[in-house]
A protein has these predicted regions:
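A charge-rich, low-complexity, intrinsically flexible signal that marks solvent-exposed coils, linkers
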Residues: 1-68
Length: 68
């Protein structure tokens, strides 16, 4: 299995849900979200390559896990 990058929103969303199960993803600032993603074990994306769109996709994937 390869290490996740910014394009792997579903995988990252699940990892964030597992790491922060009580955190409402919609209450997380993008600056914190970006840092938390880059600190995930195995994350191999370029920290400078994140965009608002990729962070939104990750946040929504995390929210889908959190709300269910």
């Amino acid at each position: 299995m390869r290490n996740p990058t910014w394009e792997d929103a579903e995988e990252i969303g699940l990892a964030l849900f597992e790491k922060f199960p009580g955190q409402d993803p919609l209450q997380v600032r993008f600056t914190d979200l970006r840092r938390w993603v880059t600190e995930l074990d195995g994350f191999s994306g370029d920290p400078a390559a994140s965009t608002e769109g990729t962070l939104e996709a990750i946040q929504m994937a995390w929210w889908e896990e959190w709300k269910s």
